[in-house]
Amino acid sequence: MAPHNEGGADSRHWHGAQNPQFFKSYGMMDGIKRDCWEGGMRVPTLVRWPARIPKGQISLHPGQFHDWLATLADVAGVPVPARSDGVSLLPTLTGHADQQKPGIVYAEYNFAGKTPEYKDFLGEHKGAQRGQQQIVFVDGLKGLRMGVKDADKDFMIFDTLNDPQESKDLASSKPELQARMKAAALSNRRASLPSKTVFDSALVPAVDVKGTVSPGLRWALYEGDFPWVPDFRQWKKPASAHGVTPSPSVKMNGSDKRGVELTGYVKIPEDGAYTFYLTTDENKGSKAFVRLHGMELIDADKTYEPGAEVSSDLGDRKNPVYLKAGLHPIRIGYVGNSGTASKLVLKWEGPGLSKKEIPASAFSHGKESR
């Protein structure tokens, strides 16, 4: 394996014999460290597990570092944590790519400077201004925008599987995908204080639900003593019961040691900045985790004290979620050892809304909500 020099970081400011183009670690791609072109982002991975992984396999499936936590949890036979953004890559690694769950491939990076003008790079990529960069993969295609000063700036769209040098921008032929990429780029992230970006106050679009929706949230009950809130979508054992509840509730009959997943939509009444709050029962071991779209909304898992109220802010720093009016997919995971004494309360605060419990009328579900 050739030595790796972090994408060939440019060393023009160095005095000496360094030549960042010597190894051409960017390969057949353009870009170096700090670029969001493929040459600055893509990292090859070698995996060896003779007992499970067939030798000689090559996979071009894109993944990110967060997928490896999920993968190693899967290998160890423990639940993939809900607070992990990743999905297990074990199906792909073991030759069952048809069973691979889709994951989130997303990145943003703000750094001054520009792509160097290496002779191997395409003319239109040489000298490209970096600034605020953002990438997102949707339907196997990569969206990339650089020098972003407006959250509505269009993505360049590339088929990196067949065009790793990103020579052909497909954006003009894919307006519908452009809109989905913009939505995905906002709905899978949270503002990261103290860093500030132009995306932080951009309104996350509501979803256009196909078909009718029905009142309440779907629930699924999983028996087990869970050490943390799992991503139940990746839990191998089936639910022991399921149904619909008018509002967030985990008081289902079954084993005292259980996990409950609630899925559906929450209807945001008005465009603006919202803060959410969650409280569980006070029973030992009670934990919860909430996602809105793909973003982490509330973490009442790590270091959580049962019965305490946790908000969607970052500790004592305000960090509201900016949402468009309409339906937004919500996923709530809960684990506890308290049976029907379990409790879950979800509140909100926003435009024209003082802090109060979210009414049952705001929750709904569709056929695809589970």
Predicted regions and their residues:
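Acidic/polar, compositionally biased interaction segments
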Residues: 181, 188, 195-370
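Acidic glycine-/aspartate-rich tracts in secreted/extracellular proteins
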Residues: 53, 162, 336-338
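C-terminal cap/loop subdomain of S1 sulfatases and analogous C-terminal strand-loop tails that border
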Residues: 8-38, 53-57, 66-156, 160, ...
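Short glycine- and hydrophobic/aromatic-rich loop-to-beta-strand nucleating segment
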Residues: 45-48, 63
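Active-site-proximal N-terminal segment of extracellular/periplasmic enzymes that hydrolyze or transfer
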Residues: 168-176
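Beta-strand elements within well-structured catalytic alpha/beta cores of enzymes
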Residues: 1-4, 44-46, 68-73, 158, ...
